[in-house]
């Protein structure tokens, strides 16, 4: 009988979850009968030899690598801060926040039962499952957050940024993941939900940036995620800082959107 590679890894305790198994596989650390395998869904007999080589993932999911890059590139510090992880899923961003000194993380997701068991039992984590961020109000948290990450799917950031902004301190910061397939018009999204056109990537980044400025969030840094999304989409990291309402907000990005998109395609395509 044959099974998916990620399932076989879970059954053999080579990974604590399918998400973690996929992360090992996509990182090129998994070998089947001595051959490197890079597809989690490939079917193998139950008798094959599976090895995990190289560096194992430092977080409960590969999502943590995305926030890790943002923190390093954008000079974001989370030490002693209260944070939110919007679209937490298994908790890769939450894990990264805790490992970088966050004292509390509100892990918010519309789903249920996804947050890693280690994080679910961590007293610093407030697990807010079955929760749509669009309807969360300050009273639900009881305290403002210093920082929030946003990694959501099947919804535009233009529907999410304002509710998140309303939950931040006066000097709060956001790192959001821009996913072109959920920002572009349906006619611009290709097969399997993949957007490959750099011009569309530039267009959606500029749309999110301009919207952020309209709600008094200053665009400070822009880069691209070090890993692609599940279907192979290139994703982008945007760093925003909160400004008082009614004040002038300038675009402080030190690089052009076009240059970041070109670099992303050069490295990840």
Regions picked out by a protein language model, each given a short descriptive name:
Residues 1-48, 82-83:
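A basic, amphipathic helix-loop patch mediating RNA/tRNA/ribosome contacts
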Residues 14, 72-79, 139-142:
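Glycine-rich helix-loop-beta junction characteristic of Rossmann-like nucleotide cofactor-binding loops
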Residues 79-89:
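Conserved class I S-adenosyl-L-methionine
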Residues 90-101:
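Conserved SAM-binding loop of SAM-dependent methyltransferases across substrates and taxa
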Residues 106-159:
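S-adenosyl-L-methionine
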Residues 158-175:
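A short glycine-rich, Lys/Arg-flanked "PGG" loop and its adjoining helix->strand segment in the class I
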Residues 180-197:
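Short, glycine-/aromatic-enriched active-site segment of Class I SAM-dependent methyltransferases
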Residues 234-269:
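Flexible, glycine-/basic-rich loop-and-beta segments that form/coincide
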